[in-house]
């Protein structure tokens, strides 16, 4: 990703510390600084979920999701119905989740089920039947990227407990 030099110039004109941080992010990590972006904080998971559902419905090109814990139930089933519909509309959908879910939340063959719907699915860090330090290296990410324009990070797991569906 290329850094927009006009953004860099504006940062140098405003505050050198910001420009230096931008330089580091761009040159050392490959993350350019942008202008005219928005961030919204969701103090309650239900608010994030409602917003994300609206944005998923708008997807036109791709939806990429990576989540730590997923369980079939109200929240995940709502998302899955949208993902299946979006695949049928020609949207590329990719989903990755942590293999710990296969322990008691999802069947081990769940990626194959999603692939039958046209969703590209991977299970990371599959459970191994022997003791290993790898099992402690879980993927706790909670990321959703829609069309490269909208993103959601953190906060919500897609389980019945998260939906307070007990």
Model-derived segments and their meaning:
Residues 1-160:
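N-terminal localization/anchoring segments of enzymes in phospholipid and broader phosphate metabolism
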């Amino acid at each position: 990703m290329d850094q927009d030099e006009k953004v860099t110039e504006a940062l140098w004109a405003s505050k050198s510390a910001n420009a230096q941080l931008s330089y580091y992010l761009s040159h050392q990590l490959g993350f350019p600084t942008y202008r005219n972006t928005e961030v919204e904080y969701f103090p309650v998971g239900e608010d994030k979920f409602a917003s994300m559902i609206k944005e998923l419905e708008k997807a036109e090109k791709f939806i990429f999701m990576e989540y730590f814990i997923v369980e079939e139930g109200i929240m995940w089933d709502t998302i899955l119905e949208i993902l299946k519909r979006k695949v049928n509309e020609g949207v590329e959908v990719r989903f990755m989740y942590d293999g710990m879910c296969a322990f008691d939340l999802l069947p081990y063959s769940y990626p194959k089920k999603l692939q039958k719907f046209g969703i590209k699915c991977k299970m990371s860090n599959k459970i191994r039947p022997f003791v290993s330090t790898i099992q402690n290296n879980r993927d706790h990410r909670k990321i959703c990227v829609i069309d490269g324009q909208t993103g959601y990070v953190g906060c919500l797991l897609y389980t019945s407990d998260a939906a307070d569906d007990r």
